[in-house]
Amino acid sequence: MTKIIGIDLGTTNSCVAVMEGGIAKIIENAEGSRTTPSIVAYANNETLAGQPAKRQSVTNSTNTLFAIKRLIGRKFDDKEVQKDIKLAPYKIVKADNGDAWVEVDGKALSPQEVSAQILRKLKKDAEAYLGETVTDAVITVPAYFNDSQRQATKDAGKIAGLNVKRIINEPTAAALAYGVDKNSNADQKVVVYDLGGGTFDLSIIEISNVDGEKQFEVLATNGDTFLGGEDFDLRLINYLADEFKKESGIDIHQDTLALQRIKEAAEKAKIELSSALQTEVNLPYVTADASGPKHLNVKVTRAKLESLVDDLVKSTIAPCEQALKDAGLSKADVSEVILVGGQTRMPKVQEAVKTFFSKEPRKDVNPDEAVAMGAAIQAGVMSGAVDDVLLLDVAPLSLGIETLGGVMTKLIEKNTTIPTRASETFSTAEDNQAAVTVHVLQGQREMATDNKSLGQFNLTDINPGPRGSVQVEVTFDIDVNGILNVSAKDKATGKEQSIKITASSGLTEDEINRMVKEAELHASEDKQKRELVDQRNQADQLIHTVQTSMTSLAQDQQTELKTLIEQLKMAVNGSDKAAIEMRQSALQEAYSKTMQTEQAQSQQAAQHQGNAANDGAKDEDIIDADFEDVSNG
């Protein structure tokens, strides 16, 4: 059976893993790292994903897309998107369907398309490691992701050429990676404290023993989608810039190249201060003014960094309190606290978590890799490689329809274990009503207008009758991925209408297919570019070989080869692979013939010398003997 990979599609970094020999193994990317920056850049008609995109992020900020996960499956008018518009250096625009898209070089791109670039890179890295084509994946999402965001994540997978077998919640995946389900047969309440690069997610999970198998249920979620390690970096960047300004009088924020260097140095210093008490940020020639080059040299202590980010760490505690309250639990009810996300390596963060929960948090799994490992374990469950886990997630928000008076009537309550199905019968609101509009909603508020609209459809041609006499059965059906299907049926006639909730916020099937084709086209272009580079490299190697070895050749032979070399160099400077191949073949053929001729002449000369030597040797073999005449005559 082909492998199913597990993917953590993160806001700041992403990660891919696979089950091997019953163990979840993280797959390194082409750059040799175990995590890949969730960054996509568009530069010089080329699309960069991961570390190459990150390296040029400051100098090409308007065309470098990061934290795109904050936009996926969201409407442009959402308050979270409006906040992002003020912070993001790239342009966020309103799509025709009201979704939040981004614009690069005048072209509108959906977050699904951009996320697909990251997924495609992870897919490619997995294929390089496994030595086989990968088509199936399990992808994780935050527990609070609504139906639109989950569907959009699946669409991103499809555009990347992946069949998304399952969408699972990140905290559930982390709990699987930590093996919390193996610790005890008793029911457990586990807190997952996930402070990543761009978001903070706090989840409380209940792990129950159901007929010898473990059931995972998310009891509560909370957090801040605009708080993460990047905010910690920013505090240190601003501190370094302020110190530099005090020293030199130069505002480094105006120099994008210098700012890129400071950004990288700040991130490195922050990481170092998780294990060291002091570090030094030393950037020679960081910028210059009329008086000459300037150098940045600042000592930073752990205590200083902690004072800079103290309020950020404290701000993670309120969501912990709220989640406990929502779950109806006290701190004493918590069995374990597990840490996820790179920022949880910071000692001050660990101390804050320990102080609040009065419990030492678990940190025995790499926090950057835990979610991807959990996704790989779930992939193993689906492929049959793992057989002792039963994974049951829950609906993150209540689902229902709009009824008389603009009220939301809930059919599926928040935190209901999925997959699930619920039906309820409604009656017509007016006499002789010939059609019923079913308006599907998601949220916790009482009034329809205060909740998120997921879509609507009409059940037409129902039998007219007095108000309340026509019975319409509405059924909500959520699959294991949290994707919702809604149907309405006239009980008298059996006439039925249904909708798969995708169109309200997301891409149409035609749009997805177009993006898949574009992705395939880019894959083809990428392949052609790579083949062109390989051809150029081969040509350069041949040129070097010929130039090195032709110095001993006759002048006329050298002249012919030099002409062919110049022709090949001209072809290499162009972009026509066929032309390079043709010129390379011509040079190779001429060089081979010349070398064969040279070799034949060398052999003849050697043979001639050998023959002459042999003749000389024969003469030398004749021994002049002295004969003594012994005859008596």
Curated annotation (Swiss-Prot):
Q: Does the keyword Chaperone apply?
A: yes
Concerning what turns on (or off) its expression, the entry says: By stress conditions e.g. heat shock.
Q: Which InterPro entries match?
A: ATPase_NBD (IPR043129), Chaperone_DnaK (IPR012725), Heat_shock_70_CS (IPR018181), HSP70_C_sf (IPR029048), HSP70_peptide-bd_sf (IPR029047), Hsp_70_fam (IPR013126)
The UniProt keyword set, sorted, is:
ATP-binding, Chaperone, Nucleotide-binding, Phosphoprotein, Stress response
Bias (Low complexity) ranges: 599-615
Please, which domain of life does this record's source organism belong to?
Answer: Bacteria
Where is the region Disordered? 595-633
Where along the chain is composition biased (Acidic residues)?
Answer: 621-633
Which Pfam families does the record match to this protein? HSP70
User: In Gene Ontology terms, what is one molecular function of this protein?
Assistant: ATP-dependent protein folding chaperone
> Which residues get modified to Phosphothreonine?
199
Q: Which NCBIfam families has this protein been placed in? A: PRK00290.1 (NF001413), prok_dnaK (TIGR02350)
What function is annotated for this protein?
Acts as a chaperone.
Give the family from UniProt. Answer: Belongs to the heat shock protein 70 family.
Q: What's this protein's name?
A: Chaperone protein DnaK 1
Species, as recorded: Colwellia psychrerythraea (strain 34H / ATCC BAA-681)
Q: Which gene encodes it?
A: dnaK1
